[in-house]
Amino acid sequence: MKYTKKEKEELKKVLTEEEYYVTQENGTERPFTNEYWDFNGEGIYVDITTGEPLFTSKDKFHSSCGWPAFSKPIDRSIIKEKVDKSHGMIRTEVRSKLGDSHLGHVFCDGPEELGGLRYCINSASLKFIPKEELKEKGYEEYLELFK
C-alpha cells in the first residue's frame, strides 16, 4: 500500500478540529476521555493523516496515563523522535515519518518485561483498523502479527 502526505488545506477538510490540532499543531487531547485510551480491540493503529501503520494492539498496555500506551511501534523506521522542551519539561516527542504528524511522547517508564518504553499516544492521531478488516483495507501483510 502506498501512503501519501496530504497538504494542510486538505487535512483541514478531512480531519476534525481536535485531530488537526493534535497532529498538525502539536496539541494534546484530554486524558481518560479519548477514543482509544481504554480500547481493547485486536488490530493495528495507523496515522490518521496518511494511513501509515504505527502500532499494534499486541503491544498496547494499560498504563493509567489516560492515553493509549504501547511498548513499541510496529517498525521503528516509521516514526521520528525529537527533543521537546515545551511546558518546562524535557521529553521525547514521537512523530510519524511520512505524515510528520505529532503522535505523542515516549517515556522510559514502561513495563520492564515489554522493553521499558511507554509510547503515550494521542487517540486523535490514530485510526484503528480491526484485525478482521486488515485484508480489505490494504493491510494484509500485518495479519502475520496476529498468528
Swiss-Prot record:
GO terms for biological process: protein repair; response to oxidative stress. The active site is at 120 (nucleophile). This is Peptide methionine sulfoxide reductase MsrB. It comes from Clostridium perfringens (strain 13 / Type A). GO terms for molecular function: peptide-methionine (R)-S-oxide reductase activity. Keywords: Oxidoreductase. Residues 8-131 form the MsrB domain. Pfam families: SelR (PF01641). HAMAP family: MsrB. Belongs to the MsrB Met sulfoxide reductase family. It comes from the Bacteria. It catalyses: L-methionyl-[protein] + [thioredoxin]-disulfide + H2O = L-methionyl-(R)-S-oxide-[protein] + [thioredoxin]-dithiol.
